[in-house]
């Protein structure tokens, strides 16, 4: 709740590793995260130019380990630092089943199968702070992930995001794609 972490296993069952005990590094890890930030920001409707202009960065916030039965009931993330507008979860390769994620916003939901190819590759999910999301129970194995705050480090003079004039084409494209998706899926989620 807020900056405090309450322990209630009916709401959330996951191991959290203290960041002071974690070093995330590798030959190209920083470049990999920067690439994921750019791609996920674009998928959230932010142009590549605005990713640079706004100085969008991912700041490591938590390292989580879900064991069998691990889950997190529907919730919205709280703002943890200035400029935070969303969350990026990078799932590291580990073998598990279950643990699908549901992300909802304004009556629309999308389910992500996080266990697909989980043992051989890392995956990511990103969402805005006003999206409700949950992690369904792990049915077997261990799910290991890094949780980052998506942060604007260089806001413009009017606020965090630039004016929407440059995003009109993106909004129109997203509306068309959403309409096609709804027609094809008849409103089904999955």
Feature map (PLM): residue ranges:
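Signature of the catalytic double-stranded beta-helix
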Residues: 2-70, 76-79
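Intrinsically disordered, low-complexity boundary segments flanking structured domains
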Residues: 42-53, 77, 89-90, 134-135, ...
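Catalytic core of non-heme Fe(II) oxygenases with the double-stranded beta-helix
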Residues: 56-59, 63-159
